[in-house]
Amino acid sequence: MMASSDLILYNLVPAQPLNPSAIPNPNPDLSIAAAEPPSSDGATPRRVRPRKSPSSSDRHSKVAGRGRRVRIPAMVAARVFQLTRELGHRTDGETIEWLLRQAEPSIIAATGTGVTPEEAPPAAVAIGSSSVAAAAAAGGHGGAFVHVPYYTALLMQPPNADEPPMASAASASGTTAADENNN
């Protein structure tokens, strides 16, 4: 039995000759009927599935990354997918966040910046020249580094009203978001 949502098309028009004026056309039956079993005259049913229209909106959250996407080599992506399965995470994003937490001591050693969750304000923390200057004032490279275990969580928070928009940072460097997308 066919479902009521199935659409069946029948080829009701016989094959057209190359010269239609040579053969008289006796009013063919072009009526559309409800879904019925194919007739014995050779018409074959064809099922057509309705196509889903592609969504134009991006389903992912935006962060302060100027609309950029992260492109990674295929081998790195394969390893992330494998780790996701091995660690039992539900998404690849969880795996990448886990990897960042594991690598945070090395990141702090390389960059000299970070914020502990106790010191972090409820809004997003700007990691920039002020953090580097504070780390340098605390004792240079040998000073106490501040830890950022939840850096991605800080990025996901909405910006404060008193923070400058990201466009000003792009214009200060001489590039625009359109230039970044073209690279």
UniProtKB/Swiss-Prot annotation:
UniProt name for this protein: Transcription factor PCF1
Low complexity bias locations: 167-183
Task of the protein: Transcription activator. Binds the promoter core sequence 5'-GGNCC-3', especially at sites IIa (5'-GGGCCCAC-3') and IIb (5'-GGTCCCAC-3') (essential for meristematic tissue-specificity expression) of the PCNA gene promoter. Can target the TCP motif 5'-TGGGCC/T-3'.
Organism: Oryza sativa subsp. japonica
Domain of life (superkingdom): Eukaryota
Tissues expressing the protein: Expressed in seedlings and leaves, mostly in the lower region rich in dividing cells.
Any one cellular-component term (Gene Ontology): nucleus
Domain TCP stretches: 56-110
Region of interest called Disordered, as start-end residue ranges on this chain: 18-68, 157-183
Cross-referenced Pfam families: TCP (PF03634)
GO molecular function, one term: DNA-binding transcription factor activity
Subunit structure: Forms homodimers and heterodimers with PCF2. Interacts with SPL14/IPA1.
Chief subcellular location: nucleus
InterPro entries documented for this protein: TF_TCP_subgr, Transcription_factor_TCP
Alphabetic keyword roster: Activator, Developmental protein, DNA-binding, Nucleus, Transcription, Transcription regulation
Location(s), subcellular: Nucleus
